[in-house]
């Protein structure tokens, strides 16, 4: 490929990662005049040693086509790195970049990346068909602290109170200015605040546009579902929201798949910040902590699976069977399924769900048997059940 595009939420480490690989760079967010130069004379900002980083390229979206033509003219690999904290609205004149520009999604750090997880059990190891054994050092309260802090690289060396303040400031910036700057459409900050709070309350759930509209409507008034949809699209554009799509798979039974996505903010720390939930409050509310823990696990699974080009989905059918995470590796034609349980009391229920999915629902003649089945927990010990289902604490999960 002639270029790589690094996308992800503000503060997840895109620029630092790109600078580590770039031979030269230009940062469009440093000066309005630099943006103007990029729009008027894009070839000028492409000059420099390669790979050449163009940081926050979306501030001058018209350079996309110019960059594509430059790649065609040079006929060389690894010429440019683009990084951006929002995705400009596509227009008919902008080429997709297919065949020329590879896309890389970055996210806040998984626990193994921040050093909170030992990483002693990898996803690959789970698929080897052998029993697992490990011990997590993370207590129930430690997990609550990790969820509230979030996985932002800039928070590694600061205390939890400061990390919470960062997450609150992050949310405030989204409410007040980030959406308008990225999307170019005026919005109501209070409406965005209510929407993100609603998403935070419904984190890891399949909340509908109608239910969110009802939840965020001020007293005595209403909000149209299409308005909610527009705001959700905008939040997706700035990567503050990352929906978890439903798995589309061939079934052997008469069950019908549900197709609604689950809602997740970019990091569980943002959900806690939006609702003013600190470590003590989260730890004392097991029900909501379970939702936040699931979101933290999904964040980590997305990161870990992406190392092998895997993608994460969820499963639900019309009989009520749900599985929290399906990892699909399209290049290897493999899949795996994970349930998420904060405590140990529902591990048996999770095991039954996983076995029912693998043995009764999925047409294994078409998609194959699962590489592994696992229950990701907030407990202490990793082990393998007689059924072959693994029980794996998040505090030992790694690459």
List PLM regions with ranges.
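Conserved nucleotide-sensing/catalytic segment adjacent to the nucleotide-binding pocket
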Residues: 38-81
């Amino acid at each position: 490929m002639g270029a790589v595009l690094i996308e992800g939420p503000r503060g997840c480490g895109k620029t630092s990662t790109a600078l580590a690989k770039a031979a030269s760079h230009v940062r469009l967010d440093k000066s309005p005049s630099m943006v103007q130069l990029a729009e008027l004379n894009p070839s000028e900002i492409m000059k420099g040693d390669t790979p050449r980083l163009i940081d926050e390229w979306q501030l001058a979206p018209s350079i996309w086509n110019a960059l594509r033509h430059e790649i065609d003219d040079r006929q060389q690999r690894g010429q440019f790195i683009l990084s951006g904290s929002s995705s400009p609205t596509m227009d008919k004149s902008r080429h997709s970049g297919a065949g020329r520009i590879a896309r890389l999604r970055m996210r806040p750090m998984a626990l193994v990346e921040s050093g909170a997880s030992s990483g002693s059990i990898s996803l690959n190891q789970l698929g080897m068909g052998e029993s697992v054994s490990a011990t997590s050092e993370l207590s129930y309260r430690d997990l609550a602290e990790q969820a509230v802090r979030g996985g932002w690289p800039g928070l590694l060396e600061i205390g939890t109170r400061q990390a919470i303040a960062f997450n609150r400031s992050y949310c405030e910036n989204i409410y007040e200015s980030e959406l308008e700057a990225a999307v170019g459409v005026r919005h109501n900050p209070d409406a965005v605040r209510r929407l993100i709070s609603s998403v935070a309350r419904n984190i890891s759930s399949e909340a509908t546009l109608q239910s969110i509209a009802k939840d965020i409507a001020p007293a005595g008034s209403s909000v149209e579902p299409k308005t909610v949809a527009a705001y959700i699209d905008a939040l997706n554009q700035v990567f503050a929201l990352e929906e978890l799509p439903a798995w589309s798979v061939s079934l052997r039974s008469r069950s019908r798949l549900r197709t609604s996505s689950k809602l997740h903010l970019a990091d569980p720390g943002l959900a806690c910040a939006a609702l003013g939930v600190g470590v003590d409050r989260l730890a004392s509310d097991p029900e909501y902590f379970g939702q936040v823990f699931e979101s933290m696990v999904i964040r980590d699974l997305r990161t870990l699976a992406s190392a092998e080009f895997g993608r994460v989905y969820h499963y639900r059918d019309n009989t009520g069977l749900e599985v929290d995470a399906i990892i699909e590796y399209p290049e290897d034609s493999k899949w795996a399924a994970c349930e998420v349980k904060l405590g140990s009391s529902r591990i048996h229920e999770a095991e039954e769900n996983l076995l029912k999915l693998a043995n009764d629902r999925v047409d294994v003649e078409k998609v194959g048997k699962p590489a592994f089945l696992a229950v990701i927990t907030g407990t202490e010990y990793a082990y393998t059940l007689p059924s072959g289902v693994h029980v794996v604490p998040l505090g030992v999960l790694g690459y």
